[in-house]
């Protein structure tokens, strides 16, 4: 009886010793594998060229700041370029492979295939409502049209700057502009804007608040209007709301990843006279009107100089962001 108990105890002790030996062996093997892996990583890390995300980036500040690529100095290998052009350009060229041709030409300037996107827009009105400025760098080609000169200059002001916008209910409220950076931006197929300035008793100054025909007309049947009135004065507005939307906007500063190239025209569009445009923009350029092939060749040839006056941005814009933070 006692012999059986001694045997059981001895077997139990041997099992514990054997299990302990196995666990220690496994631990030594795992330690060896981990240490060797870490040693290999340490040896190879100086030879690796990989994008480093998240390190040395501040967690505060503007998301508009352009952060440099710490491991890659070649700008074009890590960036995207969007080239916006009117429908008539593709119609005139009439070549199914013209984009492939331009992509190969951009490749000679350091832009890899697939990094340049060609974006077509129908007209200024549709483009202003839904710009979709998604790329790191965005270059907009606008053919000069004397009948749309004002719309073109205002579109340039719109996309070359950032705006913080809110909806306006002109049927219920009076509105005033607080400073020079505060504007009212209207968009639509036909925008006619009338204003009636009010005194401290909310009576019209030179107009009747109950009669829109006495209001001062500041825009007539335009597709895009940036309205500027006397600061600090309440205004009652009359807008063709059936074909136009109006928003109360604040200019925040330049949108430096966008450039506008005017194509042709005897007059040069210029928004630098606006006192809120500071510093004077260099991102608005002009190409003499030629065939569209010649225009695109010129853009390819001078793309490096164009990009040099721009700054890469970390945020893309769609139509929703455009309305509330343009």
Curated annotation (Swiss-Prot):
Region (CNP motif): 165-167
Signal sequence coordinates: 1-50
Annotated function: Calcium-binding protein that interacts with rotavirus cell receptors once the initial attachment by VP4 has been achieved. Rotavirus attachment and entry into the host cell probably involves multiple sequential contacts between the outer capsid proteins VP4 and VP7, and the cell receptors. Following entry into the host cell, low intracellular or intravesicular Ca(2+) concentration probably causes the calcium-stabilized VP7 trimers to dissociate from the virion. This step is probably necessary for the membrane-disrupting entry step and the release of VP4, which is locked onto the virion by VP7.
Family: Belongs to the rotavirus VP7 family.
Renumbered residue ranges of the record's region GPR motif: 253-255
Remarks, miscellaneous: Some rotavirus strains are neuraminidase-sensitive and require sialic acid to attach to the cell surface. Some rotavirus strains are integrin-dependent. Some rotavirus strains depend on ganglioside for their entry into the host cell. Hsp70 also seems to be involved in the entry of some strains.
Region entry LVD motif, spans: 237-239
Effect of residue 30 to L: Isoform 2 is no longer synthesized
Residues carrying covalently attached carbohydrate according to the record: 69
InterPro entries, per database record: VP7, VP7_1, VP7_2
Biological classification of the source: Viruses, Riboviria, Orthornavirae, Duplornaviricota, Resentoviricetes
Record note on modification: N-glycosylated.
One GO cellular component, as annotated: T=13 icosahedral viral capsid
Annotated positions binding Ca(2+) 1: 95, 206, 214, 216
Domain of life: Viruses
Annotated GO biological process: receptor-mediated virion attachment to host cell
Name of the protein described by the UniProt record: Outer capsid glycoprotein VP7
Assembly and oligomerization: Homotrimer; disulfide-linked. 2 Ca(2+) ions bound at each subunit interface in the trimer hold the trimer together. Interacts with the intermediate capsid protein VP6. Interacts with the outer capsid protein VP5*. Interacts with host integrin heterodimer ITGAX/ITGB2. Interacts with host integrin heterodimer ITGA5/ITGB3.
HAMAP family: Rota_VP7 (MF_04130), Rota_VP7_A (MF_04131)
UniProt subcellular location: Virion; Host endoplasmic reticulum lumen
Entry keywords, A to Z: Calcium, Capsid protein, Disulfide bond, Glycoprotein, Host endoplasmic reticulum, Host-virus interaction, Metal-binding, Outer capsid protein, Signal, T=13 icosahedral capsid protein, Virion
Organism of origin: Rotavirus A (strain RVA/SA11-Both/G3P5B[2]) (RV-A)
Disulfide bonds: 82-135, 165-249, 191-244, 196-207
Record: residues binding Ca(2+) 2: 177, 228-229, 231, 301
Gene3D superfamilies: Glycoprotein VP7, domain 1 (3.40.50.11130), Rotavirus outer-layer protein VP7, domain 2 (2.60.120.800)
